[in-house]
Each structure stands twice: as C-alpha cells, then as structure tokens.
Amino acid sequence: MRTVLIAGAFSLVVSLFGTPLYIRWLVRRGYGQFVRDDGPTSHHTKRGTPTMGGVVIILAALLAYGAAHLFTGALPTVSGLLVLLLMTGLGVVGFLDDFLKISNQRSLGLTAKAKLAGQGLVGIVFAVLALQFPAAGKDGTTPASTHISVLRDTPLDLAVFGAVGGTVLFVVWALIITSAVSNGVNLTDGLDGLATGATTMVLAAYVLICTFQSNQSCYSLTEVEARCYEVRDPRDLAVVAAAVMGACFGFLWWNASPAKIFMGDTGSLALGGALAGLAILSRTQILLVLLGGLFVLITLSVILQVGSFKLTGKRIFRMAPLQHHFELAGWGEVTIVIRFWIIAGLFVFLGLGVFYAEWVTGA
C-alpha cells in the first residue's frame, strides 16, 4: 500500500508544480489551441490557450511509478509496464495530432485513418505482449487472458478457436476496447476540466479495485478461496492507477475553468489508453462500461447525432458531443462540468457497488 500512496502523491506534486513551468514554455513558443469557428461561440475566447498538457500527465505518471518502486524497493511488473506502454504509445499518437493542429493552425491534425492506424498499431503491440511473459509460480499466468471479462474472467474463452485464432480474436477485442475508451475520453474533453475530473474518478475506482484484488489474490492467500482473483500483479496495477490519478489531479488545478492549459489529444488518448489497459489486465473489461458511463453517454450522443442526420437529415441534439448541446441550451460551462462530474461519480459508485456485491454474494 505504501507504494500506491507514494505513486499518487509523487505524481500529484510533479503535475501540480510542473504544469505551470510547461505552460510558460508553451506560451514562449506560441503553442496554443486552435478553435473551430463553427463551435460554440463561448469557445472563441479559448483560442491560443496552451495545449498538449497531456505531456505533463504522462511524464508525471512515469516518474511517479519509477520513484515509488525506487523508494520502496518493490520491483516493477510486466503488467504495470504494459499499461504505461499503452498510455504512452497512445499519448504519442495524440501528440502528433496536436502538433499538426498547432503547426497548421487548423482544427484537423492527423487524418482519421492515420489516427486510427496509430491507435491500432499501439493497441496490437500491447495486446500481443499482454499474452506473453508467463509468470513463474503463478501457473504460468500471463498479464492478460483470452477470456472475456465482466467483473472477473467469464467462461467465454476466445482460445476455444485455437491458439492462433484465440490470440487473433483477443487482439481484435483489445483493439475495440482501446479504441472505444480512448476516443470516448477524447470526445469528453470539450470543456475545461471535464475529462480530467471524470477520468480521475474512474482511476480512483481502479486504485480500489486493484488493491482489493491484491488482498484477495489467488496467488497471495495462504488458503485459496473460491472467490479469489486470478489477476496477474494487481498491486502494481493499483500503483499505475494511483500514479495516473495523481497526475490528473495535479493537472486539474490548471485545467479547471478558466483553463490555463488543455490536455489535448496527447492527454485524452493517453488517459483512455490507461483506463483500457487497467480494465483488460484487471479482468474488468465490461465493468469499465459502467465505471466510465459518462464517456459512454457522450460517445452515444455523437453516434446518435451522426446516424440521425445521415438517415433523416435531422439532428437530435443542438450540437454533439452532449456537453455542447447544453452549452447551446444556455447552461454555463462550470454548471455543465460539475453536473457531468456528478453523473460520472454516480457511475463510479454504482460500478464499485456492483464489483463488491459480486464478491460478497458470489453471484
């Protein structure tokens, strides 16, 4: 537990005090946000605000993870490093997108195909590696399994299609999760502090979930219990979640309205990758849909808006994603953010309740 606390505290301090230094560096180089003319008029005042703040979040999390292990003498694990790899890899894709937007002074960076290709490449590397590195003394458990998981692995095993077929299907499944979550966080990042605060809540949930899994691990109990968790390295996954959570919390101080800096795609894709990696390796893939319910609602608003317009020529919302609909309805930005945070918090509490109830009841 000490490693978890150190990781969270260290990343918070680095992010809190490192962000203003990064802001000044960005301002000197003129790296400011480009705002579309067809967006909400209230956003025009945000033009020129420093962006690519995700760089601070990523660096703070990486430094905190390393420092926590250095201070406690604990060894990093493959599971923890894989989540950080996925987070950093998607962050690089987002950084390229942000940099092109700034350089070209337009709202489009990477093409949609290039962006998806980058996300896909990073996701494939993560998924393939996650099925490698069997642990000695843990029945050869790999960081990920080919089972579809809800609150833990279910009997639905993709390996039923053979070793090769199961691996291919798992990679596809992991890509779907990674792409959906990273793009969901990206769509949510439209108002000051919204995505940062919502993601912090989900990461806090994973600190609790992975810590609980560690205390009830099939590999640490002296007597194996029927409801133990066959998760590889759950304690280190909690360390990663704490490191990223602390980084987000420190960044939120500067990202809250009126934002002094935006995380950009660098941050939103990276945070989505961290959540996806934690869900896959902690065997809570479907639970993430509930924990990240706000991201799901916002993504659905875009899907419904696009689908309705293509089929009927009419829009369901005044503007999508959903937060912009309420902006055009006259809600203040801070009001929307706080209410959406409340919704995000309710989803997180509900998800944690379902997770704990499953363990208590054995259902």
Swiss-Prot record:
It is a multi-pass membrane protein. It is found in: Cell membrane. Pathway: Cell wall biogenesis; peptidoglycan biosynthesis. Its cofactor is Mg(2+). Pfam families: Glycos_transf_4 (PF00953), MraY_sig1 (PF10555). Keywords: Cell cycle, Cell division, Cell membrane, Cell shape, Cell wall biogenesis/degradation, Magnesium, Membrane, Metal-binding, Peptidoglycan synthesis, Transferase, Transmembrane, Transmembrane helix. Its EC number is 2.7.8.13. GO terms for biological process: cell division; cell wall organization; peptidoglycan biosynthetic process; regulation of cell shape. One of its GO terms (cellular component) is plasma membrane. One of its GO terms (molecular function) is phospho-N-acetylmuramoyl-pentapeptide-transferase activity. The chain crosses the membrane at residues 3-23, 55-75, 76-96, 116-136, 158-178, 190-210, 237-257, 261-281, 286-306, 340-360. It catalyses: UDP-N-acetyl-alpha-D-muramoyl-L-alanyl-gamma-D-glutamyl-meso-2,6-diaminopimeloyl-D-alanyl-D-alanine + di-trans,octa-cis-undecaprenyl phosphate = di-trans,octa-cis-undecaprenyl diphospho-N-acetyl-alpha-D-muramoyl-L-alanyl-D-glutamyl-meso-2,6-diaminopimeloyl-D-alanyl-D-alanine + UMP. PANTHER family: PHOSPHO-N-ACETYLMURAMOYL-PENTAPEPTIDE-TRANSFERASE, PHOSPHO-N-ACETYLMURAMOYL-PENTAPEPTIDE-TRANSFERASE HOMOLOG. HAMAP family: MraY (MF_00038). Catalyzes the initial step of the lipid cycle reactions in the biosynthesis of the cell wall peptidoglycan: transfers peptidoglycan precursor phospho-MurNAc-pentapeptide from UDP-MurNAc-pentapeptide onto the lipid carrier undecaprenyl phosphate, yielding undecaprenyl-pyrophosphoryl-MurNAc-pentapeptide, known as lipid I. Belongs to the glycosyltransferase 4 family. MraY subfamily. This is Phospho-N-acetylmuramoyl-pentapeptide-transferase. It comes from Kineococcus radiotolerans (strain ATCC BAA-149 / DSM 14245 / SRS30216).
